[in-house]
Amino acid sequence: MRRSRRQGERRGRWAESLCVWWLRLHGWRILARRFRSGRGTGAGEVDIIARRGRLVAFIEVKARAEAARALEAITPRQRIRITRGAEAFLGRFPLPEKGQARFDVMVIAPWAWPRHLKDAWRLGL
């Protein structure tokens, strides 16, 4: 693995850990981190799956120098893959009765609190 890729991987894990703590402090229960449904499914990795009450959030974490660039980094193809990952998770662990699911984005930028963008997109579910 090239050095820059390793650094990016390390930064991504750090950003996810920061988001997990932020979510916990705001009353969320973490159900999974880096959830993968398996090879050959066409599903991507969901960075964080969290629950608060009857709401389950599938959260994509982006660490960028500028918050605006973080949203641009989530392509339509990536959204579809994350949605498939969420569907695979819900196939194994169904929503609670009258439960809801949504897709959120958490943005980590230097010297700023994490930004939690709720209901960032809707596909399928």
Swiss-Prot record:
HAMAP family: UPF0102 (MF_00048). PANTHER family: UPF0102 PROTEIN YRAN. It comes from Rhodospirillum rubrum (strain ATCC 11170 / ATH 1.1.1 / DSM 467 / LMG 4362 / NCIMB 8255 / S1). It comes from the Bacteria. This is UPF0102 protein Rru_A3692. GO terms for molecular function: nucleic acid binding. SUPFAM superfamilies: Restriction endonuclease-like. Belongs to the UPF0102 family. InterPro entries: Restrct_endonuc-II-like, tRNA_endonuc-like_dom_sf, UPF0102_YraN-like. Pfam families: UPF0102.
